[in-house]
Amino acid sequence: MSGSASFEGGVFSPYLTGRLPPWAGVRQNVMGSTVDGRPVQPANSSTLTYATLSSSPLDAAAAAAATAAANTILGMGYYGSIVANSSSSNNPSTLAEDKLLVLLAQLEALTQRLGELSKQVAQLREQTESAVATAKSK
């Protein structure tokens, strides 16, 4: 496919390997590694593990990008289900919507953190004012 981005790979999750019989050779709860040494979570772990199948020089970058995307989706809370259920087409509007959902989740997290910091600043201001008032009264 020239002129377009593609990612050939597989997604390994607990659902895919959890019901295979022991004779299938699936090792459970064992940390593995790829050919180039990157760690691979066990197939029954709670994290998603991505593996590329092509042999292009961009494999490492594609795997790193896929891992970062998986970590972002897992950290998004309830937005994760929206993104995970969306289609994986290369439609620009779908990709833009996915990026927007990620940005909205990050904005919500930052807004919550800002609220917490504002409360801490208000408490420190009150403590400082009471300490100054106590010092002046002595």
Swiss-Prot record:
Task: Give the superkingdom in one word.
Answer: Viruses
Q: Which HAMAP family match?
A: ADV_CAP9 (MF_04050)
Additional record remark: This protein is only encoded by mastadenoviruses, and may therefore play a role in mammals tropism.
Q: What is known of its domains?
A: Three N-terminal domains of hexon-interlacing protein form triskelions between hexon capsomers.
Question: Signal peptide location in the record?
Answer: none
One Gene Ontology term of the biological-process aspect is: symbiont entry into host cell
Known Pfam families for this protein? Answer: Adeno_PIX
**Protein's job:** Structural component of the virion that acts as a cement protein on the capsid exterior and forms triskelion structures consisting of three molecules that stabilize three hexon trimers at the center of each icosahedral facet and fixes the peripentonal hexons. Dispensable for assembly. During virus entry, recruits the anterograde motor kinesin-1 to the capsid docked at the nuclear pore complex thereby subjecting the docked capsid to a pulling force.
Organism of derivation: Human adenovirus B serotype 3
Q: What is the lineage of its organism?
A: Viruses, Varidnaviria, Bamfordvirae, Preplasmiviricota, Tectiliviricetes
Q: What is this protein called?
A: Hexon-interlacing protein
Give GO terms: molecular function aspect only: hexon binding
Primary localization class, coarse? virion
Induction per UniProt is:
Expressed in the intermediate phase of the viral replicative cycle.
